[in-house]
């Protein structure tokens, strides 16, 4: 495995909260989300009755920022440009279920539980602000 890929995977493992940007009415909309990963593929959960679900249905292009934890500008982070789709697999919904989601979704069997799969088109990894 290449060193940059290893660094990105390690960062994905350490940083679960990031921003997800979608497009609505030709404008970007960002929100904080809880992310999980399988290799370089990202997953995030939402309620099916949200604007982001509608945004992705209309335009699957998304942008994710992961890595920054508020400690000045010294942290590694990544910008991920990708395509989002709905993941229907009950097995993956169970695998990526997290109790922190209970505020929005009652459990992995909740019919409103929508698991979004983000397939990267490009990943830019920064070791600190201003580097690439």
Label each residue range with its predicted role:
Residues 52-120:
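Short, structured beta-strand-loop surface elements
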Residues 120, 130-132:
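Flexible glycine-rich active-site/ligand-binding loops centered on an Asp-His dyad
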